[in-house]
Amino acid sequence: RETWFLHSVNMYICLLIILTGLLVVVIVGIFRYEKRVWLRRNPKHSRLLLPSWNEGSKNMGVAISRVDDINYGRHVSFSWFDGRFITAGRHRVAFEYYEYYFMARRYNRKIIYKKEMVFNFKADTVYVIEVLQERQTFRITADTNNYL
């Protein structure tokens, strides 16, 4: 009787692990599909690498709040893990330099400063966004080491 109980518990644990794995695969698959669709619709695009780093219990980084007066640049850009893909051409982009305390009980992302910049993004080019904290601005440079 005890072995039957242990066998059924082990079976449920294995089933739970398998279902969790399938859920992760489905979520990753959806993200990859959405990326592929966006890249197919926007063949002339650039990539922006947005820096992010930890300082103790806080995360510092750069985010995009608007692209061409569109919140988060929906349809004009596509967010990916270490940055964004953006359609080639001239865009007005609002960058934010922020700090985020990940040990806090509630979400408290503090924007240190914002800067709106107009830039002409060339197709098939990777751009690195650098923080110039002393001047409270950003520098956009083409990265020759990374490729799309």
State where each predicted segment sits.
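Short loop/turn and low-complexity linker motifs enriched in small/turn-promoting residues
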Residues: 1-148
